[in-house]
Design a protein with these regions (language model features):
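Walker A/P-loop NTP-binding motif of AAA+ ATPase domains
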Residues: 1-168
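A short, flexible helix-to-loop-to-beta junction within the catalytic ATP-binding CA
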Residues: 80-81, 190, 194
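C-terminal engagement/docking regions of AAA+ P-loop ATPases
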Residues: 1-5, 13-16, 20-21, 58, ...
Length: 238
């Protein structure tokens, strides 16, 4: 007798695996994954944007059960409080959240966001999503696991040749996506010298990289404070 789950909102800085989480959920549940780019729904003609939203809803419900992945929902509604678009953003927002709150079809919504300040309070309010998860930067244990994943992908069976414990210590504040780029850059260093890349190449790559957490430290701090002050679940088990 339980109603169908509405969905989840995944909030975190870029590169923490929000998009990957959406794809993994769809794979685990063996359901089709529909990706919605809200930016493409907005049109210049009055009323056309709302019509596109309703069309999107019709398609999702016709394909249900399915997963609707709303990527970077914060950017879509960043202008909801302004009057520069003649209220189009507000009307699109109203259409979407009304459907989200009242829908009875088995469409599971996974929305991702980088900047919580851009998300209207109506979207986060109880009853819209079943849960709001905060995806923090990976811990040392998680960074070690991420290095293992990428090293085993690029050098199957040889990941133990690298000092992964040391690498996880040196890559503090790196996101999962940034760790992947560290590995790719180290591979380039080895390729340029016609040899296999080593732990030393990975260390050099780490030292040359400036993680987003450093360049946007204020935004990250605000995001952490928001996560700690509200009814938000942490996605990490550590």
């Amino acid at each position: 007798g339980l109603p169908y789950p509405k969905g989840v909102l995944l909030v975190g800085v870029q590169g923490t695996g929000k998009s990957i989480a959406a794809k993994i959920i769809a794979s685990e549940w063996e359901l089709p994954l529909l990706r919605l780019d809200f930016g493409r729904l907005f049109a210049s003609l009055v009323g056309q944007s709302e019509l596109r939203v309703r069309k999107m809803i019709q398609i999702a419900e016709a394909l249900s059960p399915c997963i609707l992945w709303v990527d970077e929902i914060d950017k879509a509604f960043a202008g909801a409080q302004s009057s520069g678009d003649s209220g189009t953003t507000s009307r699109v927002l109203a259409t979407f959240i009304t459907w989200l709150a009242e829908k009875t079809s088995p469409v599971f919504v996974i929305a991702t966001a980088n900047n919580i300040d851009w998300i209207p309070p109506e979207v986060i309010r109880k009853g819209r999503f079943d849960e709001v998860f905060f995806l923090a930067l990976p811990t040392r244990e998680e960074r070690q696991a991420i290095f293992e994943v990428h090293l085993s992908k690029f050098r199957p069976g040889k990941e133990r040749n690298f000092e992964i414990g040391l690498l996880s210590e040196l890559s503090k504040d790196f996101s999962g996506a940034e760790i992947e780029q560290v590995v790719i850059e180290a591979m380039r260093l080895g390729f340029n010298e016609n040899r296999e890349f080593t732990t030393e190449d990975l260390i050099i790559s780490i030292q040359k990289s400036v993680p987003l957490a450093k360049t946007k430290s204020k935004e990250l701090k605000a995001l952490k404070e928001w996560a700690e002050s509200g009814n938000v679940a942490r996605a990490s088990k550590y």
